[in-house]
Amino acid sequence: MGRKRVVVLGAGGSIGKNSLEIIRRFPDRFELAGFSVHSNSGFAKTLLAEFTDAQFVSTKKKNSNLKHEIDEEAVRRLIEKSKADIVINGIAGSAGLKASVEVIKSGLDLALANKETIVEAGELIFQDAEKSGSTIIPVDSEHAAIFQLINAHKKGNIEKIIITASGGPFLNTPREKLSTIKLEDALKHPTWKMGGKISIDSASLANKALEVIEAVKLFSFPPEKIEVTVHPQSIIHSMVQCKNGEIFAQASPPDMKNPILNALSFPKMPESFLKPLDFSQIIKLEFMPPRTDDFPMLALGFEAAGKGGAYPIAFNVANEEAVDAFIKGKIGFTDLADITQEVLNSDWTMKPSSYEEVYDYENRARAIALARILDRVNGLQ
């Protein structure tokens, strides 16, 4: 088999740039068939000068500056023209769902880094993937680890999934200081280099909440059989506990290039270029329970996962809008969970049966979240 032709959606983001590094490092295995950026035309020109045969589109929707909107037709055009074998979806936020839908409809394999796709519309995505023949390979380090562990130990033998969390930059911050956290502090992740939104999600534990919901849907495990443990070193990416009580872990240095390379190489096991862990040296591994009282987003995520219906959609959109408001200085750090809770207080029991219904629920949740944010801006809360 020749080189895999790869399309990178969201090439200017953290996942996109790491994916491009993999393609550069292994020109005998992969070639860049196409890529998208949202609006960074300068970055696109630089890439086109380097990858002269690659197709390119901007996913920015005309006459719209909203981050949650993308040009689906542009994604469809890119997929058709690129003649790709696999697509990496590194688009951040709920906008990535529409891109995933286009990839799945095309029948191409999807290396999925956009967790919102599964959180909001996992059941619909899996149905369409079965019809089109697409394989969905998780790129998130935790879900990539679980994916490998389940393949190795068989789902029927597994009693519990254990997802690790770094604890973020405020792992040891006293509760009374959380309300005074500044944006620049929330962006300083201790172990991972990530984009702004996901860095803040990590700081609030919203990212881990989304990962719990994603794991419930991706691996068909109930939330009561999923546990989160704080592991500051980010060396163990996830674990599974088998029915005999034994626990198996996936361990590797905290570098997103590893799960990206694995996803692009699937179903083969690639030879990595990353330096493996050296157990001849002292390696410190710590585990502790998450501070759910101080960081309530994780508990809200478990609640949304357990209730099902459109609750995961409401959780994701509420958090997305709250994070955007925090970045713009409109609300404080502890408002992130309060706003999300207020949105979840509405009735979201109806399960969406189409993508259109998913988008309707998104719009409804977004309107409530924006109203709650405006209340705070106007000093009403």
UniProtKB/Swiss-Prot annotation:
Catalytic activity as recorded in UniProt: 2-C-methyl-D-erythritol 4-phosphate + NADP(+) = 1-deoxy-D-xylulose 5-phosphate + NADPH + H(+)
Residues binding 1-deoxy-D-xylulose 5-phosphate: 115, 141-142, 166, 189, 202, 207-208, 211
Binding residues annotated for NADPH, in chain numbering: 13-15, 40, 114, 116, 195
Keywords: Isoprene biosynthesis, Manganese, Metal-binding, NADP, Oxidoreductase
Entry EC number(s): 1.1.1.267
Top-rank EC class of the record's enzyme: oxidoreductase
Pfam families for this protein: DXP_redisom_C, DXP_reductoisom, DXPR_C
Co-factor requirement: Mg(2+); Mn(2+)
Domain of life (superkingdom): Bacteria
GO biological process, one term: isopentenyl diphosphate biosynthetic process, methylerythritol 4-phosphate pathway involved in terpenoid biosynthetic process
Pathway: Isoprenoid biosynthesis; isopentenyl diphosphate biosynthesis via DXP pathway; isopentenyl diphosphate from 1-deoxy-D-xylulose 5-phosphate: step 1/6
GO molecular function, one term: NADPH binding
Residue numbers binding Mn(2+): 140, 142, 211
Family: Belongs to the DXR family.
Function description: Catalyzes the NADPH-dependent rearrangement and reduction of 1-deoxy-D-xylulose-5-phosphate (DXP) to 2-C-methyl-D-erythritol 4-phosphate (MEP).
NCBIfam families (UniProt xref): Dxr
HAMAP family hit by this protein: DXP_reductoisom
The name this protein goes by in its record: 1-deoxy-D-xylulose 5-phosphate reductoisomerase
Organism: Treponema denticola (strain ATCC 35405 / DSM 14222 / CIP 103919 / JCM 8153 / KCTC 15104)
